[in-house]
Regions:
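Juxtamembrane/disordered regions of integral membrane proteins
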Residues: 3-150
């Protein structure tokens, strides 16, 4: 990888970070949900009318306590962290741009999640969305420690 074109290497770093971020996000979701005692999320019924599905999700989120939101919060941030870490390790110039782009893609997923699942607590959404880029920055800082700039 040392003789590769830097632009191509940075594109590859961004793609690798984005690919790693998805399973890293999902990896913690179920274990943290069990750890906090969160009730199982309702099953998705594609035949149900949208209003019924929205009511089910709102009732589900209303039944949760603040501690139950730690699982989704930490798993979302884990995706941004791991994706930025991988991008930072692979990127040609060790700059912040590629890891933050990866964290930004994960942030876009978090914003989409806020619109797709109705009834999520506003405080959770605010903390969740505000955390993606700082956690991506932390992933980049760890990448610099693991593989410092030559």
């Amino acid at each position: 990888l040392t003789v590769m074109n830097p632009i191509l290497r940075n594109i590859m770093a961004g793609m690798a970070g984005s690919i790693v971020s998805m399973p890293a996000n999902m990896f913690l979701l179920a274990p943290l949900g069990r750890l906090t005692g969160a009730p199982v999320a309702p099953a998705f019924d594609p035949t149900a009318p949208p209003a019924a599905t929205e009511a089910i999700w709102r009732a589900y989120f209303d039944s949760l306590e603040a501690v139950h939101m730690l699982g989704p919060l930490l798993s979302h941030w884990n995706g941004a962290f791991c994706g930025a870490l991988v991008a930072g390790l692979i990127a040609a110039n060790r700059g912040l741009l590629v890891p933050l782009i990866v964290a930004g893609f994960v942030l876009i997923g978090g914003i989409a999640n806020a619109f797709i699942l109705p009834g999520q607590p506003a405080a959770f959404l605010a903390i969740d969305i505000l955390g993606y880029l700082p956690v991506g920055w932390l992933g980049w800082k760890l990448a610099l420690r693991i593989r410092p700039v030559a």
